[in-house]
């Protein structure tokens, strides 16, 4: 058994190591600077109490993006030096973010241990490669992202760090082969266990969903299916679940080989970046591929996000979570005993609110960031939650879960088609959504993203909008000047959240303008980009009249869009005449 000593390496703080909503994300060239990664990892160890580190087991894996291999080896060596007893690594360093959460919560190691936390190496939906993004975040023993108290402490430590601990001479571990490698150090034996990345997660999915019912659906000749992993880590799980377990043809999988640069693409499952899937589903500009599949879905780099499509039909994430919640008890065995409650992020449309009211469920509106849902789940008051940024999930783990959302939709389709196994007239994705609108009304919804805007201009825009809120008569003069048919603004504020579980308060979570007819305009600066600022504008309008729920959303929302752009002086502050992405 190889032995190692602990080295103390002198270092100096780097500016800007403040974790955002999902960890620290920077360009690879920033992370590759001497001591940069080590400073952040040591600051994380120092922010955690000894009982969470000494003699404990940690998970270290990620989405396979460029720089992951080096980072995993560094974190293994630093874990050994900081008194960790065992490190678990997914084979090839791969684990989806929801799978990491499942592994922390469910897996038992060869030595009988359970994990007390994880370093997840991902920048989620951001591009990968030598000139692109890398990221790291820490998840706690509940499987969820570190709470603000911990991330604030990590940041504080990064500003004062003087040294880090590392087992320099520990040889690199072969992470392509499953098995345990053991070393001897000052605190005794240190193990690195490389394990099958899919096993724990697949077992969990099989305990939640009726795989036989989904298999029957996929065997209907007229039910065609397409899944695009955008060369992210989801591909590993897609092959195992959709092909091996559920019997789908391998030809129904697109871009399911993980690549460190995501094939040169942008692994963000939306109508702009998932071009190949969008074309195949009949939603592209050209429609030369014949009849589209009945169901399509896509994932982001670390497989926590999802996009759901029907044939020539896009399901908004806000509608998706509402439809899953409305059908969960009937269609998904895990929820057969009823839902504890539901929650959405503030910018997400109020479609879920209407379902909660209709079904008499507890309902919560939280800031953007999955950790807020985790608190509600740990308290046993939330079963299903979602956010407009293509994140949907439930209390089976403490992260959003892209493949879970796809299986939820397949379960609903299987349930609606259970008496229709010859597939003569399938109940389609579009049918399910339109039936939902007929029952609950429709929330027309769109999001405008202005990416990599000058940070100064973005901050000025937000400050201007806050100041404007103090004079609603001025606001309504601007509104009516743009479009007389738009309802009056009756309230405007900056969203603030008091956590009902731990009492913590989160301020400055987005600027809201609320209209008399239930419409909303929301402005936020995003915390997930690696440079510049991203301004997000959310526009929502509720339509109860079922005869008016079939309009094109961009057409229905045009008056409100015009109001939002004028009200915010978007072009003046951002320097952009149009958004980077419209969803």
Swiss-Prot record:
| Cross-referenced SUPFAM superfamilies | Phosphoglucomutase, C-terminal domain (SSF55957), Phosphoglucomutase, first 3 domains (SSF53738)
| GO CC terms, sorted | cytosol
User: Principal localization?
Assistant: cytoplasm
| Record's subcellular location | Cytoplasm
Q: Disulfide bond: is it a keyword of this entry?
A: no
Q: Which residues bind Mg(2+)?
A: 124, 300, 302, 304
Gene Ontology terms for molecular function: magnesium ion binding; phosphoglucomutase activity
Q: Which residues bind alpha-D-glucose 1,6-bisphosphate?
A: 25, 124, 304-305, 368, 387, 389, 400
Q: What reaction is this protein's catalytic activity?
A: alpha-D-glucose 1-phosphate = alpha-D-glucose 6-phosphate; O-phospho-L-seryl-[protein] + alpha-D-glucose 1-phosphate = alpha-D-glucose 1,6-bisphosphate + L-seryl-[protein]; alpha-D-glucose 1,6-bisphosphate + L-seryl-[protein] = O-phospho-L-seryl-[protein] + alpha-D-glucose 6-phosphate
Keyword check for Zinc: no
What PROSITE patterns does its record include? Answer: PGM_PMM
InterPro entries on file:
A-D-PHexomutase_a/b/a-I (IPR005844), A-D-PHexomutase_a/b/a-I/II/III (IPR016055), A-D-PHexomutase_a/b/a-II (IPR005845), A-D-PHexomutase_a/b/a-III (IPR005846), A-D-PHexomutase_C_sf (IPR036900), A-D-PHexomutase_CS (IPR016066), Alpha-D-phosphohexomutase_SF (IPR005841), PGM (IPR045244)
* Similarity section: Belongs to the phosphohexose mutase family.
Q: How does it assemble?
A: Monomer.
Q: What is this protein called?
A: Phosphoglucomutase, cytoplasmic
Q: What is the lineage of its organism?
A: Eukaryota, Viridiplantae, Streptophyta, Embryophyta, Tracheophyta
């Amino acid at each position: 058994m190889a032995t190692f000593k602990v080295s103390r390496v002198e270092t100096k703080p780097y500016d800007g190591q403040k974790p955002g909503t999902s960890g620290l994300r920077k360009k690879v060239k920033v992370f590759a600077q001497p001591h940069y990664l080590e400073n952040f990892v040591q600051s994380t160890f120092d922010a955690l109490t000894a009982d969470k580190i000494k003699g404990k087991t940690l998970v270290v894996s990620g989405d396979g993006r460029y720089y992951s291999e080096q980072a995993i080896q560094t974190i293994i060596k630093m874990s050994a030096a900081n008194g960790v007893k065992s490190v678990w690594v997914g084979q090839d360093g791969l684990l989806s973010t929801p799978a990491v959460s499942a592994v922390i919560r469910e897996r038992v190691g060869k030595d009988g241990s359970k994990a007390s936390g994880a370093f997840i190496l991902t920048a989620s939906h951001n591009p990968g490669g030598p000139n692109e993004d890398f990221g790291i975040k820490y998840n706690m023993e509940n499987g969820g992202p570190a709470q603000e108290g911990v991330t604030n402490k990590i940041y504080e430590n990064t500003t004062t760090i003087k040294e880090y601990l590392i087992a320099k001479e520990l040889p690199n571990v072969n992470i392509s082969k499953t098995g345990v490698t053991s070393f001897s150090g000052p605190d005794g034996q240190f193990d690195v266990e490389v394990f099958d990345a899919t096993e724990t997660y697949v077992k969990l999915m099989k305990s939640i969903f009726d795989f036989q019912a989904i298999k029957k659906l996929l065997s209907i000749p007229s039910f065609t299916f397409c899944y695009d992993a955008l060369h992210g880590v989801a591909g590993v799980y897609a092959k195992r679940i959709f092909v091996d377990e559920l019997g789908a043809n391998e030809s129904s999988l697109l871009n399911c080989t993980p690549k460190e640069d995501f094939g040169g693409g942008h692994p963000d499952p939306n109508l702009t970046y998932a071009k190949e899937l969008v074309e195949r589903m009949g939603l592209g500009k050209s429609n030369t591929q014949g009849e589209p599949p009945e169901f399509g879905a896509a994932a982001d780099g670390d497989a926590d996000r999802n996009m759901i499509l029907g044939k020539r039909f896009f399901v908004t994430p806000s509608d998706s979570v509402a439809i899953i919640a409305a059908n969960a008890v009937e269609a998904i065995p895990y929820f057969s005993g009823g839902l504890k409650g539901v929650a959405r992020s503030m910018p997400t449309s109020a479609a879920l609110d209407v379902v909660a009211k209709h079904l008499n469920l507890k309902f919560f509106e939280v800031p953007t960031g999955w950790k807020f849902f985790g608190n509600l789940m740990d308290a046993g008051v939330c079963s299903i939650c979602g956010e407009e940024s293509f994140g949907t999930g439930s209390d089976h783990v403490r992260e959003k879960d892209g493949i879970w959302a796809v299986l939820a939709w397949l379960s609903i389709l299987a349930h609606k088609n259970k008496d229709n196994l010859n597939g003569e007239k399938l109940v389609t994705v579009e049918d399910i959504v339109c039936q939902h609108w007929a029952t609950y009304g429709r929330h027309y919804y769109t999001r405008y993203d202005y990416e990599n805007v000058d940070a100064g201009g973005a901050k000025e825009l937000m400050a201007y909008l806050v100041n404007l809120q103090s004079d609603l008569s001025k606001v309504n003069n601007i509104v009516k000047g743009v479009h007389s048919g738009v309802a009056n603004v009756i309230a405007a504020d900056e969203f603030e959240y008091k956590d009902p579980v731990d009492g913590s308060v989160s301020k400055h979570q987005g600027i809201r303008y609320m209209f008399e007819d239930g419409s909303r305009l929301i402005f936020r600066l995003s915390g997930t980009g690696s440079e510049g600022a991203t301004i997000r504008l959310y526009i929502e309008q509720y339509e109860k009249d079922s005869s008016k729920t079939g309009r094109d959303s961009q057409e229905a929302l045009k008056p409100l869009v015009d109001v939002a752009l004028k009200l915010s002086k978007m072009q003046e502050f951002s320097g952009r005449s149009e958004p980077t992405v419209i969803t």
